[in-house]
């Protein structure tokens, strides 16, 4: 069996990959969201040419092929290439799941079942009281027992979204959500070490348990300093996609919790490797999964399989009113939350079906054996 055709269906925000073998078997994957039309072009220029005609073994064993692409395209290291490779990786995992009539979770040592979530707010343009109303409503209606909200401004160079917002939202949500709800915050690379430490100690007094990306993510020594000065867990790694960076991060003990993103990393295989390296260092893995696309589906499968899975699956609380591009991507409701959990079903592959109407309205490209 070999790969015969690679098709992409894209818009500015999202791009799906359809992989077809010479036997007519099909797998569906996705490249990382945002500027996905650009990523699709990279896919057909720099990923698909190496993959058309690739002979596939009976069981998943294509990690070396992904590395080969990276080596062949060594003049183009970084995020865009790996975002494109993620489309191939995730399509192959879906293919193998369907060939073996198993969910991807079962192929990687996990199993179907429930996965606990934390509700992840993506908004900073919202007052603490308005955010409290949203999160308390989700707590009461969906049984969600952990939430993450935003402090500082994104890459804010030590500036708040507006003056005093960070301290206020910590105080308001800590009080309103109650002691039985786990409270996590995300700084999105905002703060200097000094400011992050000051805010972190304030948050410790308000029951916050997780401080994500407190300093510019590329400044590992700054993040490590914050980790060493605080009692709460410092998390990071969502932006990192290079294995040497991950090895350095883990050797230097920069964070308490690692957060690779399946789509930024180049797919499931490479994310599993980060999780394995973190496990060797005794660190939990709580991957980044910040929207309701295939990234969240892939991540819930992953969390059933790794021994160092974090407490929760990141689960965006933003629907199509905030992210219109998420509307009607899949048939059914693969993101249904019951009592604070989502489910990995027994359906083969990723267990989702992409909406045909969405595909018909996308931009199409193909690479195939002539």
Question: How does the language model describe each region?
Answer:
Residues 114-230:
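Metal-dependent enolase-superfamily TIM-barrel catalytic cores that perform enediolate-based chemistry
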Residues 20-99:
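Metal- or metallocofactor-binding catalytic centers and their adjacent structured scaffolds
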Residues 49, 60, 207, 218-341:
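Shared catalytic-loop signature of beta/alpha-barrel
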Residues 319-370:
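C-terminal extensions of enzymes
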Residues 1-28, 32, 321-324, 328-329, ...:
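Structured beta-strand/loop patches that form or line metal/cofactor-binding pockets in enzymes
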């Amino acid at each position: 069996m070999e790969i015969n055709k690679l098709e992409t269906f894209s818009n500015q925000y999202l791009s799906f990959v359809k992989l077809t073998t010479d036997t007519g078997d099909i797998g569906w994957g996705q490249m990382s969201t945002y500027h996905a039309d650009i990523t699709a072009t990279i896919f057909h220029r720099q990923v698909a040419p190496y993959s058309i005609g690739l002979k596939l073994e009976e069981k998943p064993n294509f990690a070396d092929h992904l590395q080969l692409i990276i080596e062949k395209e060594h003049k183009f290291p970084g995020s865009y290439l790996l975002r494109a490779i993620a489309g191939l990786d995730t399509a192959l995992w879906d293919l193998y799941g369907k060939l073996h009539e198993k969910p991807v979770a079962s192929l990687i040592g996990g199993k179907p079942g429930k996965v606990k979530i934390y509700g992840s707010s993506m908004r900073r343009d919202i007052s603490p009281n308005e955010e409290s109303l949203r999160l308390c409503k989700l707590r009461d209606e969906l049984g969600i027992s952990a939430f993450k909200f935003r402090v500082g401004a994104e890459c804010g160079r030590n500036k708040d979204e507006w003056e005093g917002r960070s301290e206020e939202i910590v105080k308001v949500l800590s009080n309103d959500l109650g002691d039985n709800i786990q409270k996590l915050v995300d700084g999105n690379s905002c703060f200097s070490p000094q400011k992050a430490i000051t805010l972190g100690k304030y948050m410790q007094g308000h029951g916050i348990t997780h401080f994500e990306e407190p300093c510019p993510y590329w400044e590992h020594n700054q993040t490590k300093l914050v980790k060493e000065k605080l009692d709460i867990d410092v998390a990071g790694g969502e932006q990192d996609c290079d294995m040497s960076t991950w090895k350095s991060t883990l050797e230097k003990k920069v964070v308490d919790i690692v957060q690779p993103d399946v789509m930024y990393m180049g797919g499931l295989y490479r994310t599993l490797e980060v999780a394995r390296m973190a496990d060797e260092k005794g660190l939990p893995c709580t991957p980044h999964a910040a929207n309701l696309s295939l990234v969240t589906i892939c991540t819930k499968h992953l969390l059933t399989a790794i021994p160092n899975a974090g407490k929760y699956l990141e689960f965006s609380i933003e629907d199509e009113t905030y992210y219109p591009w998420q509307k009607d991507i899949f048939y059914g409701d693969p993101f249904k939350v019951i009592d604070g959990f989502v489910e990995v079903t027994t359906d083969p592959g990723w267990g989702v079906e992409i909406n045909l109407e969405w595909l018909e309205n996308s931009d199409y490209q193909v690479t195939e054996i002539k």
